[in-house]
Regions:
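Amphipathic alpha-helical segments
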Residues: 25-41
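N-terminal beta-strand motif that seeds the catalytic metal site of vicinal oxygen chelate
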Residues: 1-30, 57, 77-81, 129-144
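Short secondary-structure junctions
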Residues: 38-44, 100-104
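Conserved short beta-strand elements that form part of the metal-binding/catalytic scaffold
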Residues: 40-74, 122-128
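Vicinal oxygen chelate
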Residues: 25-27, 79-122, 130
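Loop/turn position at the start of each blade in beta-propeller repeats
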Residues: 14, 48, 108-110
Length: 144
């Protein structure tokens, strides 16, 4: 087996289009992702129980899980949101009432700060400041 990841054998998956973010209160979530985080909203269809927010490369599809017949289990693994400066972004969100889990930390290649949306979905402010470690696979299709 190869140590480096590379193109697949032409499988059917091309990319990730959206990540579903469950909520129990769609109006509250729309306010949080739009007003608090400042993400542009592209769709809000209350009668269909969802809204979508855009980042430059991925859509966050906020769904009223229970109204769609799905158990509302928060995303705990985390959704990493790229920012230019974690410290500045954190300070701005703290001014808007966001509470963070612990201090901002440095992994040696990036800075991260963890927080939750009102439903307990973990979000991460993230900024990579160093190249990927040597020996790690390059991301297929990533901009140079």
């Amino acid at each position: 087996m190869s140590e480096q990841a590379g193109p697949t054998d032409g499988g059917p998956i091309e990319r990730v289009d959206f990540v579903a973010v469950p909520t129990k209160d769609l109006g509250r979530a729309v306010d949080f992702y739009g007003s608090t985080l400042g993400l542009p909203r592209s769709v809000y269809i209350e009668e269909r129980h969802y809204a979508e927010f855009e980042t430059s490369n991925l859509t966050l599809s906020v769904i009223d899980a229970e109204k769609m017949g799905i158990e509302c289990e928060p995303v705990r693994s985390g959704i990493a949101l790229h920012v230019a400066d974690v410290g500045q972004a954190r300070a701005k969100l703290e001014q808007r009432g966001v509470e963070f889990e612990g201090e901002t930390f440095d992994t040696g290649v990036c800075h991260m700060a963890l927080f939750n949306d009102p439903d307990g979905n973990r979000l991460i402010l993230h900024h990579r400041y160093a190249p990927r470690p040597s020996g790690s696979a390059e991301r297929v299709g990533a901009a140079a």
